[in-house]
């Protein structure tokens, strides 16, 4: 198995466990250049809020888009948007990525901004 296939296998297992909880899911995706985060409804059918480093206002604020400071901005932004949408408690879906570096920074920033997981 290659690296992507093993990551996707880990993600599938985690998502199955999160689906049993019936809570909103904070899904994170990272590429070498960007970070993406979205909050998905418990039924898995729709995205309630999203934030990423692709957004114009976030690109202008951060020094680059593929680093920890940009990931922290995405974490703060997704938490603010989630609270505005009435979501305070989520399950963290790291999409099979290691809980380290940018993924951990995004999660910590979202927690500091008031999201509970």
From Swiss-Prot:
GO terms for biological process: translation. Pfam families: Ribosomal_L18p. Keywords: Ribonucleoprotein, Ribosomal protein, RNA-binding, rRNA-binding. Transmembrane segments: none annotated. The gene is rplR. GO terms for cellular component: cytosolic large ribosomal subunit. Part of the 50S ribosomal subunit; part of the 5S rRNA/L5/L18/L25 subcomplex. Contacts the 5S and 23S rRNAs. Belongs to the universal ribosomal protein uL18 family. This is Large ribosomal subunit protein uL18. InterPro entries: Ribosomal_uL18_bac-type, Ribosomal_uL18_bac/euk. It comes from Alkalilimnicola ehrlichii (strain ATCC BAA-1101 / DSM 17681 / MLHE-1). This is one of the proteins that bind and probably mediate the attachment of the 5S RNA into the large ribosomal subunit, where it forms part of the central protuberance. One of its GO terms (molecular function) is 5S rRNA binding.
């Amino acid at each position: 198995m290659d690296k992507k296939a093993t990551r996707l296998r880990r993600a599938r297992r985690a998502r199955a466990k999160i689906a049993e909880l019936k809570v909103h899911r904070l899904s994170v995706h990272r590429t070498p250049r960007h970070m993406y985060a979205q909050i998905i409804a418990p039924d898995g059918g729709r995205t309630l809020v999203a934030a990423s480093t692709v957004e114009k206002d976030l690109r202008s604020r951060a020094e680059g888009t593929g680093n920890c400071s940009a990931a922290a901005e995405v974490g703060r932004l997704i938490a603010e948007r989630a609270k505005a949408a009435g979501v305070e408690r989520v399950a963290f879906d790291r999409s099979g990525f290691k809980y380290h570096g940018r993924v951990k920074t995004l999660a910590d920033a979202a927690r500091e901004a008031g999201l509970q997981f």
